[in-house]
Swiss-Prot record:
Keyword set includes Ribosomal protein: yes
Entry-linked InterPro entries: Ribosomal_bL36, Ribosomal_bL36_sp
GO cellular component: cytoplasm; ribonucleoprotein complex; ribosome
Protein name: Large ribosomal subunit protein bL36
Homology family: Belongs to the bacterial ribosomal protein bL36 family.
GN (gene name): rpmJ
Highest classification ranks of the organism: Bacteria, Pseudomonadati, Spirochaetota, Spirochaetia, Leptospirales
MF annotations from Gene Ontology: structural constituent of ribosome
Length: 37
């Protein structure tokens, strides 16, 4: 899980979702998981 100021989709599988006001990227590739501060 990377915590970044700006989250971006890295590959076509990545999805940007909002969960309790936190913007996250979920993906089939665990390396692509991101969360916004």
């Amino acid at each position: 899980m990377k915590v970044r100021a700006s989250v971006k989709k890295i590959c076509p599988e990545c999805k940007v979702i909002r969960r309790k006001g936190v913007i996250r990227v979920i993906c089939t590739n665990p390396k692509h998981k991101q969360r916004q501060r």
